[in-house]
Amino acid sequence: MAGAEGFQYRAVYPFRRERPEDLELLPGDLLVVSRVALQALGVADGGERCPHNVGWMPGFNERTRQRGDFPGTYVEFLGPVALARPGPRPRGPRPLPARPLDGSSESGHILPDLAEQFSPPDPAPPILVKLVEAIEQAELDSECYSKPELPATRTDWSLSDLEQWDRTALYDAVKGFLLALPAAVVTPEAAAEAYRALREVAGPVGLVLEPPTLPLHQALTLRFLLQHLGRVARRAPSPDTAVHALASAFGPLLLRIPPSGGEGDGSEPVPDFPVLLLERLVQEHVEEQDAAPPALPPKPSKAKPAPTALANGGSPPSLQDAEWYWGDISREEVNERLRDTPDGTFLVRDASSKIQGEYTLTLRKGGNNKLIKVFHRDGHYGFSEPLTFCSVVELISHYRHESLAQYNAKLDTRLLYPVSKYQQDQVVKEDSIEAVGAQLKVYHQQYQDKSREYDQLYEEYTRTSQELQMKRTAIEAFNETIKIFEEQGQTQEKCSKEYLERFRREGNEKEMQRILLNSERLKSRIAEIHESRTKLEQDLRAQASDNREIDKRMNSLKPDLMQLRKIRDQYLVWLTQKGARQRKINEWLGIKNETEDQYSLMEDEDALPHHEERTWYVGKINRTQAEEMLSGKRDGTFLIRESSQRGCYACSVVVDGDTKHCVIYRTATGFGFAEPYNLYGSLKELVLHYQHASLVQHNDALTVTLAHPVRAPGPGPPSAAR
């Protein structure tokens, strides 16, 4: 233990407080124990690595910001930390609780998987729906909801006496429901994608946590809960404060194990990530609810003309054939399509819920995009009850001629200008490979400049967000300190009156002056703390305002980045289809052409081992097994395997000595790593293309080609440094 001020541990099992001095634990909680505390317990050097042998340990829970005792059998050792913590307090011997068995009921997981609890079109598990409905029928209270204490484990989920529950019991039951699930709502894989979305250029993080990244039942449950928490925050006196408090309470429940700082890099977990993620998600839902138009009132009964195709005796037009129907596209792409378009421009896409029959109409009005949900029940469609249209095509056709103002006075427009999926602009105007390459170089440079600007803003945003969190914590500490001093002042004032009266009778002027001086000093100290807190609150408000401005600047850059990336990609696709050499494309992109590998010298491309699928396709193995197969291999060694995402594959490739993973999508146009590159008729065609084409065009960190099939003969490990 010599040299380390403290040691960090991570909770493996949940633990419920048994005594006032105990700490509540959730899996993934980070705990710090001082070296002095362990020495006081008689722990020898090296003994800190075996917490199950130590017994009860005094420490600090970084999630709850509380100190207390926790059982060493419930945690695992992480490593030393340079954090000094107060020494232990004396306590008597106490037996340890039994270490929970993996998968046993000791952990409190008594509910079945979400997939076994409900099925679409239900929005969420019936238990959760009942609890939320009961809470929203009563007065919403974000303070009760955001308490860090964990509820007692519940074994009866029949909810038969729900009407008799008070507000606190309802709030605790929602948390207890999440704790009782056998697995976190946000899977580790989805959390890793969300972590990347927080760091990289992307749209709202909520779009990442949709199927197939997050399983359907988890995605529906998460969306239902986020909508509820968003309503709770909006009704709070201070929505921003409520969002942070709710995220602190629910983040560790929805995401029990924080992801590591990078993928496959062995970095330490990010302890605040569950809170940061949920804070962003709830904030997005609050903003979405604020931006959405008011609920549509019932539609007045009105005779509607028959569709033209039916009137002429033809068959009704198909939704798939409608020019304004774009299918499954993201909200960001919709925003891009409607950018700088006149009022009345519109398109229809599949709803983000991915439930069959649900659609979203996006309409341009007042320079903004208005989202209108298309409801569906029993084969009928509409914007609100009653649902009178027999198809989405019939619904849209009707409002090509009728104003939406009858539903919402602010939507005083018709569906005038459809965004046609058949008339997309031809971006590439040049007609020669050299001219297209030169223009690609210009767009790529613009994209890199914008990316650097965004990265700088993101670093500044992250830094200021951390500082804001520290200041919020400091204000909480000030509040506790003021409370202690004021209680001390009240006690002193009460006692001082008795002693002053006594010393006045005795004529002891010296003691009277000492008591009065102490009282004045205490009042002065309280005033100083109040003043410091006020100054800190002012700094917090100013910095929060600056932080919001940075966020706005980042958001304003995102559409430009997406547009430049899209244009650059279309130029790359054009060059690839025209047979441009990859070496030349690399020069235009400013990518250094690597030295020739053992296969690039082959005159006959048919002799490449890449033609043999058995050299690189390994079938159904998981990420860990793939990393084991590629361990110690040279850069560019790769394999293709089945992905955990249904209908997709995964490419695992060695980059700078580490194994990286990327999804290969299978779409109607072919295989590929991303749109618009899903062009390859088979996995073999894709592998042969990226044998000489760098993956860097898809991800700046993937500076390799698919050079060496993992099962091909030839040198495997990298050569030793000379």
UniProtKB/Swiss-Prot annotation:
The record marks 147 as: Arginine finger. Residues 112-293 form the Rho-GAP domain. The keyword GTP-binding does not apply. One of its GO terms (molecular function) is receptor tyrosine kinase binding. Keywords: Phosphoprotein, Protein transport, Repeat, SH2 domain, SH3 domain, Stress response, Transport, Ubl conjugation. Residues 324-419, 616-710 form the SH2 domain. The keyword Protein transport applies. Residues 87-98 have a biased composition (Pro residues). SMART domains: RhoGAP, SH2, SH3. The modification Phosphotyrosine is found at residues 458, 599, 649. Heterodimer of a regulatory subunit PIK3R2 and a p110 catalytic subunit (PIK3CA, PIK3CB or PIK3CD). Interacts with AXL. Interacts with FLT1 (tyrosine-phosphorylated) and FLT4 (tyrosine-phosphorylated). Interacts with FBXL2; PIK3R2 is a substrate of the SCF(FBXL2) complex. Interacts with PTPN13; dephosphorylates PIK3R2. Interacts with NYAP1, NYAP2 and MYO16. Interacts with XBP1 isoform 2; the interaction is direct and induces translocation of XBP1 isoform 2 into the nucleus in a ER stress- and/or insulin-dependent but PI3K-independent manner. The SH2 2 domain is required for interaction with FBXL2 and PTPN13. This is Phosphatidylinositol 3-kinase regulatory subunit beta. It comes from Mus musculus.
